[in-house]
């Protein structure tokens, strides 16, 4: 029973809502922004360490931030990856194409947690 730590250079001190939102986004973008998956993640987290009401508001704010657009634009601008123009175009189109599902998810999340 050993634990191996990877990417320790990304380690930082941050509020809980930040970590939860990052994990949720990674999962939900692969699950068509299904609210049920988000609820399962939050319920599992709450079973160990319940979120406070104010943390739900911060979590919602983090979920609204266009992180994926920003990260993609940042990588493109600073030439952080060796992708051709078509790769960037395809990635941005993919994010745009899921915008309707993402917006519906945000609305449903807001209603579910009375935000």
Positions of predicted regions on the chain:
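Active-site acidic catalytic loop and adjacent metal/ATP-binding pocket
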Residues: 1-18
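Alpha-helical structural elements
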Residues: 3-5, 40, 65, 78, ...
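Alpha-helical structural motif
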Residues: 16-19, 55, 88, 98
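Active-site activation/catalytic loop segments of kinase-like enzymes and analogous catalytic loops
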Residues: 17-50, 64-81
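Short amphipathic alpha-helical surface patches that serve as generic macromolecular interface elements
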Residues: 38-42, 56, 89
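All-alpha amphipathic helical-bundle segments outside canonical DNA-binding/catalytic cores
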Residues: 53-62
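ATP/Mg2+ or Mg2+-diphosphate-binding catalytic cores
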Residues: 70-115
């Amino acid at each position: 029973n050993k634990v191996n730590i990877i990417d320790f250079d990304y380690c930082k001190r941050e509020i809980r809502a930040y970590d939860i939102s990052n994990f949720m986004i990674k999962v939900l973008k692969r699950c068509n922004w299904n609210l049920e998956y988000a609820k399962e993640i939050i319920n599992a987290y709450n079973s160990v360490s319940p979120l406070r009401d104010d943390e739900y508001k911060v979590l919602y704010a983090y979920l609204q931030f266009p992180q994926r657009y920003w990260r993609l634009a940042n990588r493109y601008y600073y030439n952080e990856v060796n992708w051709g123009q078509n790769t960037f175009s395809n990635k941005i189109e993919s994010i745009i194409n899921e915008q309707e599902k993402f917006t519906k998810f945000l609305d449903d999340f807001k209603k579910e947690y009375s935000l």
